Amino acid sequence: MNESPHFSVLLQESVESLVVDPAGTYVDGTFGRGGHSRAILAKLGPEGKLFGIDKDPEAVAVGKALEAEDSRFRIVHGSFADLKHIDLLQADFAAGGLSGVLVDLGVSSPQLDVAERGFSFMNDGPLDMRMNTEAGMTAAEWINTAKQEDIAQVLWEYGEERFSRHMAKAIVERREIKPFTRTHDFAEVVKAANRKWEKGKHPATRAFQAVRIFINRELEDLRQLLDDSVSVLAPGGRFVVISFHSLEDRMVKRFFRDQSMGKQFPKGLPVTEEMKKQNLKIIGKALKAGDTELTQNIRSRSAVMRVGERLG
């Protein structure tokens, strides 16, 4: 299986924002093919430690090879949503917390470009879409069994697809004739049901995004990480998030705002000072890829990086 090269987005900017203590303990919550992790290790001293996390067994295999190269690195097969409960990190939590956490929420080029993974409408393959190919329901299994109203809800909520109901109806009508098994097949049905294409965007883009997010519980996982982030960071520790679509970025932006300003509550509610506490300081402005990076990697065009620092 030939993989496309994966360019880590905002690599220099994210690592420089993350590594504030070369002797600290860090987490790369989306290891992928190790681009960010290798850059982090290059900035760490001999006492520094880095833990990589990934759902994808293929990414974990790459991480195992990096473990053999560098004793400061360990790979964990799982989700960053479980960060707080990872056994290997409990000693660091007990000792005061992590020096930094980085997550790059984008789908990697190998996942998108390898047809067998089923993420892309550009390459025909099995309609799978699972980040963790060893567990959970495939996209085909869900699409072929879900209620029409549930499909419409997913397309609307996770893809912001305005023709969600029309598409869901077309999907259900077609699966009654023949179940979906291939990405191109699904893309063609969605494409035909898209009444008005967005300029410069494939008509199946939003539907594929929506199903992928739903199958992999991407927003639920992100919400859990945001909820746990302050408690796992040491004072002065950095939280770096790179998001790729508005659903993710809105969640991250709102979280950083609430944690930096102190959460706002309606008047009259019984609110404690702890509930209104400022937990994060926002570092710099939201950052996007520059012209040079865009030339090298067009997929970085929608990336937005936000950085927060844990207050004591």
Curated annotation (Swiss-Prot):
SUPFAM superfamilies: Putative methyltransferase TM0872, insert domain (SSF81799), S-adenosyl-L-methionine-dependent methyltransferases (SSF53335). One of its GO terms (cellular component) is cytoplasm. Pfam families: Methyltransf_5. GO terms for molecular function: rRNA (cytosine-N4-)-methyltransferase activity. It comes from the Bacteria. It is found in: Cytoplasm. Its EC number is 2.1.1.199. The keyword Transport does not apply. GO terms for biological process: rRNA base methylation. It is an enzyme of class 2 (transferase). Its main location: cytoplasm. It catalyses: cytidine(1402) in 16S rRNA + S-adenosyl-L-methionine = N(4)-methylcytidine(1402) in 16S rRNA + S-adenosyl-L-homocysteine + H(+). Gene3D superfamilies: Putative methyltransferase TM0872, insert domain, Vaccinia Virus protein VP39. Keywords: Cytoplasm, Methyltransferase, rRNA processing, S-adenosyl-L-methionine, Transferase. S-adenosyl-L-methionine binds at G34, G35, H36, D54, F80, D104, Q111. Specifically methylates the N4 position of cytidine in position 1402 (C1402) of 16S rRNA. NCBIfam families: 16S rRNA (cytosine(1402)-N(4))-methyltransferase RsmH. Belongs to the methyltransferase superfamily. RsmH family. This is Ribosomal RNA small subunit methyltransferase H. It comes from Saccharophagus degradans (strain 2-40 / ATCC 43961 / DSM 17024). The gene is rsmH.
